[in-house]
């Protein structure tokens, strides 16, 4: 019995198949794109955390990267260029910490070396005991940075993210001083929203509180911003931790 030729797909059936297939493919692409962006934002926040923690390591374990023709005198406020080579560790100044300053746009952080130039012999008794507290010793240590000859490096948050104030999209500008006491070697952290504050004025108990630093995803994710938090009185990298959605 002749059953006729096999029946193919109609135009409508073909169009429906293509439409459904297109929607499925689009959904897969959107889903994978969202997952990729979420991972990028996670990487950006983890990178920011690692950056801050590395600055504590730089303050505790000094890296003297200066050129051998740079020197410094007791009581000085800048590095000087010498005609002869000066061995590292033989000048009258010491590297004492790191100063981090966020740009007004929130798109970069500059890190500079902090030096101390004062003779601290009066900070100790004849028996070697420390006289006065760390804050007093730090304030009297002749703090300075040298924008011309000192080390300065910039860090930009990854994937076009930027630093913003908590709960807003406004850029967040601040300065963070991570400093090692030249007397006790204890690490202290001072944070201020006033980027024009001098180093001496920055060393104040009012600047040792907890500080939240948020990272704007700039559309990478639709959930809330994430960031890091400096614990009050942070003395090391462990005092900086990640914070999740809802805290920024």
Pin down the residues of each PLM region.
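N-terminal single-pass transmembrane signal-anchor helix
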Residues: 2-41, 45
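Aromatic-residue hotspot detector
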Residues: 9, 77-79, 163
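Generic hydrophobic segment detector
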Residues: 13, 22, 36-39, 87-133
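Localized chelating/binding microdomains
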Residues: 16, 26, 49, 75-84, ...
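Membrane-proximal N-terminal amphipathic helix
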Residues: 36-70
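Short, glycine/small-hydrophobic-rich surface segments
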Residues: 59-106
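Intrinsically disordered, low-complexity regions enriched in Pro/Ser/Thr/Gly and acidic residues
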Residues: 104-248
């Amino acid at each position: 019995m002749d059953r006729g030729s096999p029946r193919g797909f109609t135009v409508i059936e073909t169009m429906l198949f293509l439409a459904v297939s297109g929607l499925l493919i689009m959904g897969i692409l959107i889903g994978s794109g969202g997952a990729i962006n979420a991972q990028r934002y996670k990487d950006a926040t983890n990178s920011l955390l690692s950056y801050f923690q590395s600055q504590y390591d730089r303050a505790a374990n000094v890296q003297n990267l200066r050129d051998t023709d740079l020197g410094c005198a007791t009581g000085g406020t800048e590095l000087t260029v010498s005609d002869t080579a000066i061995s590292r560790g033989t000048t009258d100044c010491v590297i004492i910490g790191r100063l981090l300053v966020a740009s007004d746009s929130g798109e970069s952080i500059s890190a500079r070396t902090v030096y101390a130039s004062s003779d601290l012999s009066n900070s100790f008794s004849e028996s070697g005991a420390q006289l006065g507290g760390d804050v007093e010793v730090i304030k009297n240590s002749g703090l300075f940075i040298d924008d011309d000859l000192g080390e300065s490096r910039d860090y930009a948050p990854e994937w076009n993210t930027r630093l913003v104030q908590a709960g807003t999209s406004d850029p967040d500008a601040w300065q963070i001083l991570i400093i090692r006491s030249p007397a006790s070697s204890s690490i202290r952290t001072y944070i201020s929203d006033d980027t024009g504050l001098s180093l001496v004025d920055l060393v104040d108990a009012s600047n040792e509180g907890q500080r939240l630093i948020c990272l704007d995803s700039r559309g990478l994710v639709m959930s809330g911003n994430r960031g890091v938090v400096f614990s009050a009185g942070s003395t090391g990298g462990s005092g900086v931790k990640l914070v999740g959605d809802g805290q920024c």
